[in-house]
Amino acid sequence: MNNDAMEHTLGGGILTTSGSKQRKTSKFVMGKYTLYETKDRMYIVGSNKRETMFRILEIDLTVPRGELTVLEDNVFFTRNEIMNVLASLEEATEDGLHKKITGYGLLGFIKFTCWYYLIMVTKYSQVAVIGGHGIYHIDGIDIIPITNNYKKPEKSSDEARLLNIFKDLDLTKTFYFSYTYDITNTLQTNILREKLKAVDRCDITIPCGITDYNEMFVWNNNLLSPIFACIDTVFDWFQCIIHGFIDQVNVSVLGKSIYITLIARRSHHFAGARFLKRGVNNKGHVANEVETEQIVTDMILTPFHQPGNGFFDSDRYTSFVQHRGSIPLYWTQDASNLTTKPPIRINVVDPFFSPAALHFDNLFQRYGGGTIQILNLIKTKEKTPRETKLLWEFEQCIDYLNEFLPTLKKLDYTSWDMSRASKQDGQGVIEFLEKYAVNTVTTTGIFHNGPDFASTKIQEGICRSNCIDCLDRTNAAQFVIGKRALGCQLKSLGIIDNSYLEYDSDIVNILTELFHDLGDTIALQYGGSHLVNTMETYRKINQWSSHSRDMIESIKRFYSNSFVDAQRQDAINLFLGHYSWREGFPSLWEMNTDFYLHNAYSLNMPKRSYIHWWNDYNIKSVKELINEELIATGNDVTREKIIKNVRGYPGAFDNYWNEYYLPRSVTWIRDLFAYNMNSTRRYHNALSKQDKAMSPFTSRKQSWLNNKLKMITSSKSLEKAEGRVVETTDLDRDTSPKQELELYEHYLHIISDRSQKLEEKMNSFSYSKYPIFISHESSEIPPMRKVIGEPLVDIAEDFTDVYDDDDDGDDENDEMTTEALLIAPDHVSVDEKFYEKVLNVDDYKPALDDYSAVIHIKPDNLQLYRDLCFSKDIQLDFQ
């Protein structure tokens, strides 16, 4: 059967709406909900932040037990009108109208055995702001029974037991929502959809087949399902929540704020605890599947729009997306024997790898049909085969699937034993990951918004990283890839001119903290403890106390996996709707396994082709689609189309700035989220006045590592052939010492040639022992710059650019200008004793790891350069 003719239902699409199309009203955004109760009805009064407009949702309590009836008339009320409505309800009801609770979000309804419960958000806190839209963390909830004769169930009843199991999933930890921004989709998806509205092409779906919220990441989809059959404005009233991690930091660059936002979205399809959820289910959903998005914003303008008639056209927004997930095979680990490393078993050997095919087809669908890069970090050599069992099977899977894919769409697979590399001397882990990161970001690209489709850069493809647990090793690998992507994003925004970011700089330190917090959160959700191995482990800069910390976290993880995970898995299955109570069927606590809750088998299911295993629509390039349908046809975004298709009268839109500056209350600047955000400024508090001006891109701990990484990644830098796919086989996965020496020798020859040319130009200089003073205003020589840690070749390039002769043969002005510049001004006093103490180059002995000092340059030339460095008119940062 041709897969193109099949209904594509994997991992995306509109939420289950029982045939009714949901619509979202843009008149105003509700942010406050008050629940009133009478004998026969419940009324939810929703209002905007300013409390100037209101709506009413009615719940009928007279329906038979176990049924839910929700009504809404889509009528909008002013403040005076809503007061009159409530007063009339008070008079018309015998027992009166009682105010029950006030909340700030509605999550949905759930039923166990008797009646429904309403889940309401009662407390929340802001964690990020994107385009002026607030993103919030749930801090408190309330569970409200929808009945007029509620009695607390007996402890031994199924109702009470299921209610307690439901409460075991703590919704006040790492669950997030937003009133006005779709956090279930990436920034690229959200902005491209809005641009399509501007050109009246909403028939184009990005990603393919997903037209609304991405159901894969909507954790309260089960809670919303009872309401879809009742009203068609569900998303006006109820908030979609995600489970994962969101944090935001501020990088201060010369007083300008650069926001870095990290969003991790956990899939709810095959969710669960570590040893209880491994591998893949029959629908292609893998365990511990997390999408990580890195958004970098220049906050010179807060909204997505440029001033005037712009519409989602700000070029100050960039993003980059990564993916992690368990190896897509049928495999399990039995933790019942209380061992720290249970044996790995491959339960089903599928010669056609059907679940893996579904999984990768879904990745093609969600990430624009681009190249899927697979970084497999599990062990490749073991005395007793454990992880290697999966290695062999996974490689056969990739080979089989690649056999039928078009050449340009083949899965780009790389296997590398990160655990073994970390036990060897040196920085092999960081070096390999840095080279792989360059290849990854070059292949997939980043998203950078522009005024129209033609100027917008789109990320196509995804890097999928995995180890056994997709925790420690995977998190370190994603950090290094994210670090390279961050450099590319900053370069695209015009903040820096080199996409390499130095380790131990402020911006890398704060990014390390972000990924460390993300890794800890994902590890707690899946493994029951914090990360055991962090970036400090793989960089080998751990403190003596880290070993005891690692041991404690290992013990916590072992305890959680052995005694707590089963209870947590029951709560997840109940919350997500994998289990529903039915009379006469086994109770949740009586089930020996939840395998059939996550794997639905049916004899009537259509079979996918084992050869043409992908959907042709999913592998179609988003860039090609936009170019064919919009740019080539002359239907790109213009001001006139924006005004015609999306700009209504100004009063039709609620001012989302009300989220930022709360109306009807005094707002202190010190209480604003942006004021209290984590920032690189905190690194300056304990430093001297001179160090406070240090760039956030300058390393605070100079090491040979930054020099070496610049060297080994420069040949594959992102500046070359943007969008070109670099084959993974070109990477030096296991660079031998001989190859490394040859690499250094090659670069040393280049530097030596340039230094020899520099020496020839400088030999004719005559200068005294006094420093040379050069005035920027009168000199044609540009200010020199030297960042600590750059290779010496950069110094030679800067110096040669200044003193190189032009090819036109005109040397007259060169001699006159050079001689004039070497004369110190009469009015400048020089401390001769100070300069007599300057380091003697003849006595200088380079350290073993100082690669830049191996070059042979005459001492007098180096002394001249040092004299230039100590000039008071030229401020250099040189050691």
Swiss-Prot record:
The keyword Phosphoprotein applies. Residues 166-528 form the SAC domain. Its cofactor is Mg(2+). It catalyses: a 1,2-diacyl-sn-glycero-3-phospho-(1D-myo-inositol-3,5-bisphosphate) + H2O = a 1,2-diacyl-sn-glycero-3-phospho-(1D-myo-inositol-3-phosphate) + phosphate. One of its GO terms (biological process) is regulation of phosphatidylinositol biosynthetic process. This is Polyphosphoinositide phosphatase. The modification Phosphoserine is found at residue 829. The PI(3,5)P2 regulatory complex regulates both the synthesis and turnover of phosphatidylinositol 3,5-bisphosphate (PtdIns(3,5)P2). Major enzyme required for hyperosmotic shock-induced turnover of PtdIns(3,5)P2 and requires VAC14 for this function. In vivo, mediates turnover of PtdIns(3,5)P2 at the vacuole membrane necessary for vacuolar size control. In vitro, catalyzes the removal of phosphate from the fifth hydroxyl of the myo-inositol ring of phosphatidylinositol 3,5-bisphosphate. It is a peripheral membrane protein. The keyword Phosphoprotein applies. Present with 339 molecules/cell in log phase SD medium. Keywords: Hydrolase, Membrane, Phosphoprotein, Vacuole. Pfam families: Syja_N. It comes from Saccharomyces cerevisiae (strain ATCC 204508 / S288c). It is an enzyme of class 3 (hydrolase). One of its GO terms (cellular component) is fungal-type vacuole membrane.
